[in-house]
Amino acid sequence: MILFPAIDLKDGQCVRLKLGDMDQATVYNEDPAAQAKAFEDQGFEWLHVVDLNGAFAGESVNGKAVEAILKATKNPVQLGGGIRTLQHIENWLSKGLRRVILGTVAVRDPALVIEACKAFPGQVAVGIDAKGGYVAVEGWAEASELGVIELAKKFEGAGVAAIIYTDIDRDGVLAGINWDSTLGLADSVSIPVIASGGLASMDDIKRLAAPDARKLEGAISGRALYDGRIDPAEALSLLRAAA
């Protein structure tokens, strides 16, 4: 069970959004690379990074900040936001990124995801961001008529490394993970699922360590870590013991 600390990038800074709203951004660190190193020093073994501007623009916007993060930490990094082509994927993986996260393109062009999995085995994840059970795209700005499980099943057997499942209604508001939908997704597909959105306290960490949650690959934490609601050492110890 992996706890992924999150760095969301907006205008070169480390921020957290409330409900995915770019106008409701709280700046937590003006130096994302320093934040990445701090997470490594706290004992985290992975890092989850999102280029928020890139998610809306459809291409990398905070590239310099991401490159600085890759230089600052020895931990493997997964990146989402604005990665829409095979060239984008190859570019980032060549710079030392461990895993790319494909979101909008997974809805718009599922065949590209399958092609990417063949070209870059084990290095392609799919980000499924949901609102009311339906998938949202373009930085959560647009709703689709595609169901979460319906989309996930399109990639069964394709070699997708993981599905990062985000409940938009809980993201950045410390409401707790949507356990029913997250575990329901994990039960419906063989692809490893990572929970994102809503992780609020050590109670959620303890819930992650419960036997029925061990089917998840892990969970992503942002605001709860930055606000001190989760003790890194205690959380990592609990999850490692549950592995």
Swiss-Prot record:
Amino-acid biosynthesis among keywords: yes
Pathway this chain belongs to: Amino-acid biosynthesis; L-histidine biosynthesis; L-histidine from 5-phospho-alpha-D-ribose 1-diphosphate: step 4/9
EC number: 5.3.1.16
NCBIfam families: 1-(5-phosphoribosyl)-5-[(5-phosphoribosylamino)methylideneamino]imidazole-4-carboxamide isomerase
Superkingdom, natural source: Bacteria
A Pfam entry, by short name: His_biosynth
Gene encoding the protein: hisA
UniProt-recorded Gene Ontology molecular function terms: 1-(5-phosphoribosyl)-5-[(5-phosphoribosylamino)methylideneamino]imidazole-4-carboxamide isomerase activity
Key words of the record: Amino-acid biosynthesis, Cytoplasm, Histidine biosynthesis, Isomerase
Top-tier EC class: isomerase
UniProt record similarity statement: Belongs to the HisA/HisF family.
GO terms classed as biological process: L-histidine biosynthetic process; L-tryptophan biosynthetic process
Catalytic activity: 1-(5-phospho-beta-D-ribosyl)-5-[(5-phospho-beta-D-ribosylamino)methylideneamino]imidazole-4-carboxamide = 5-[(5-phospho-1-deoxy-D-ribulos-1-ylimino)methylamino]-1-(5-phospho-beta-D-ribosyl)imidazole-4-carboxamide
Full protein name: 1-(5-phosphoribosyl)-5-[(5-phosphoribosylamino)methylideneamino] imidazole-4-carboxamide isomerase
Active-site positions on this chain: D8, D129
